[in-house]
Amino acid sequence: MKKAIITKRIVSIFLSSITAFMLPSQAFATNLSDKNIKYSSFDDIQGNGEKAANIVMELEEERTENTKLFLLDDGSKMLAEYTEPIHYKNDNNEWAEYNNTLVAENALYSADYDTDYTNKSSNLNIKLSKKAKPQNMINISDDEYSISWGYENTNKSNIIIDNNDVDLNENDKFTSVENIASQVTYENVYKNVDLQYFVTTTGVKENIILKNSDVQNEFYISYKTKKLTAKQTDDYTITLYNKDNTPVYMINAPYMVDEKGEASSQLKLEILSQNGVNLNIKLTADYDYVHSSNRSYPITIDPELTNKFSSELYLNEVYGNSTLNHGPYYISNDHYIVAKLLKLPELDEGEKIISAKYNFEIKNGSSLFANETNSPIIINAHKLNGIENGVVSYESDILDYDSLSYNDNSKFTFDLTKLTKEWYDNGDKVDGFVIEGLDTAESRIANLKESTRTSATPSITIIYKDYSGTESNLSYHTVSAGYNAQAKVSDYLGNLVVSQKLYEGTGARMPVTILATYNSIKNNDINGCGWYFSFEQCIKETNKNLSNAGYNYIYIDTEGTSHYLKKSSSEEKWLGEDGLGITLSVKEDCIIVENGNTTQTFDTVANGGKILSETDKNGNTVTYSYTNGYLSSITDGSGRIIQLGYTGKPDGSKRINQVTLPDNEKISIYYNSSEIDTISAFVFPDKKTSAFYYDKNNKITKEQLQNRTLENTAVISKHCFIYNEKGQVTKITEYGKNNSEGNYINITYSNDNTTVFEDRNGLKTTYTFDNKGVLMSVLNANGYLESNHSSGLQNTSGADSFTKNILAESYEFSTIGTNKY
């Protein structure tokens, strides 16, 4: 059932080519000096050719008006952004896909009771009559306004519905939205004139097609408008206002275009009469343009009635000394395009881009090549430097390129991962990029496809991964911190991870180790902002969409990292896909997880999925006991018991504040306030203390090893951490007993997947990563690629990635240690 609600009230009728890119209304002159036109060079192509993982499913709950989010089979996610709406809010207030397939129904607006055709599922009710006629031929309505129109003195041409099936494969089957538009044609409504309509997600696009020179150049259109008053704005614009004098619709006639792409703005739109709901308009196309001996037919004039939607990606075409901000858009030996994102898709702090691709479709690809011997058109992408005083300037280096050829001419794609990362690094400041084929187009002109298709494909696909857990395939720089703690900074992400050891049992019969892990990316865990205790590991169910794809369970490990488990095709088990060998099976009253040499038992998901026991291959077992839903004790394989104590919060919940060890010694846990769960200190039985200090974003800026007594608190050592605006650690400094500064290291993160570490002596080491953050190489201060370091550290990547002490292990800084890192 269609919901006749327009969520954005301002609606426009554009007599313009509606391409896949909706643009701002202003235009500006562009004078392109020779020095700013730097022709293509393949000496430094920066694009990335990594193939995307396969799409598992769409995460429907993450939909927006013009985006979809997909889960990939490697655990990453793909955000697909479209240049037109693909979803609307249905009666259940859910984002539903448009289905503009036309179906027949009895006419409500036809005097002769012929059949009307209406779209299936949309927030706009759109009807098209069976025959061309002077009134109520096209009707669009919502809950408040309606507008209909027809052409005077037309032939009664029958509607012809064009079903345009599209062959799709691999990820395109998920990202392409079918039935997004319907196409119909009324042939020969006038002599040598066709009317073509596209029912789209924003309304109706109309083409007046002049098939040869023996045609009229004047058209009379009769509108019926409900609760609206028309006013002539200028020679080519008519605006429709409601009773509050607010513009609701706009009729605009900016240009027309012939088959070769020669455009003209010599169109005139004028009000002839207005009486109540009846509005009569005359559209005049320039006679000389229409009947020129140089004209290539057909000529297309493009009226449109839509609800206003602005894409985040817009284009300007540069040609000669001017820039055009409306279609059609051409790539040739003297036309190129400036593309820019108005707004970057939002990513959370722990999410990192793996890939960013920009997709463009060609309308006239098959006509560009007569046969296979024709040379391809190489289309290049360059970084835009800026537009100043009407002059477009861009880098000569090629970011990426694609080609159009005789056998492959329907689209081109740019991998602009590095450039997109740079935009995110610059605080969402987007300069854009230039698309050109100046060197190879020769006399050919490529025309970007308009958004008048039955299916929609994304213009942008961004693949990213959530790195909020402690990733085993990433490398870290590590320093001993506090008491029995380590602080490590991810070389790729720049987040700070603190691992605080609270207890480590001994013996061979399944001893227990208790860790508290802080991650600066995660600020909302229940036991302290960014903190997670190893005994909090649990099993959770996924949402409905993931479950339908076979991902029924999430295993959250001792460091708070989530592992999605997929159902096996051959047996009733769920398997991890990250190579860690995790296997889950469901029993009547519990869940069993095989994790290496350990078998873990968890409570049912209905009871919280809490861990109940762990058993090693020799049958030794650790048991976990709960009181009123909170873990109260842990018993190791030798029968030693660790007890946990809690303190209440104002909201009635509890948080851990004490760990009682098997010898009855106690570790106290302190928080900064009763409401904000930032752990301020772990105080051990010998009064050695790990103390932590935070900024306003709950990120640790300082840790101290203290010796706390009743009389005073003595600081033994400390480390300070400085962050940039993106939450990445950019400097680590160590201090001794007397607050004397020891070694420090500065860290610089670049959008080209490199990180540079520089110590106080100015020695630099450069780490290079792939797009997934896996370490590929290390270039030392002497300019050599390292496979081993003098510290004995092996430079590896993947599951064998390393940690490394970067600062001298010294509490008395009479010297600066070895200055190695």
Predicted regions and their residues:
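Short proline/glycine- and polar residue-rich coil/turn motifs
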Residues: 273-277, 333, 403-410
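Residue-level detector of buried hydrophobic side-chain packing
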Residues: 208, 219, 301, 342-344, ...
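Intrinsically disordered, low-complexity segments enriched in small residues
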Residues: 1, 5-14, 18, 28-96, ...
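Beta-strand-rich interaction/scaffold domains
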Residues: 364-429
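Residues that cap or anchor secondary-structure elements
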Residues: 31-308, 427, 453-454
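A short beta-strand-loop element at or near the start of a globular domain
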Residues: 200-210, 314-367, 497
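Extended charged/polar low-complexity repeat regions
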Residues: 500, 514, 520-522, 529, ...
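Proprotein-processing/basic-patch segments
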Residues: 328, 421-468
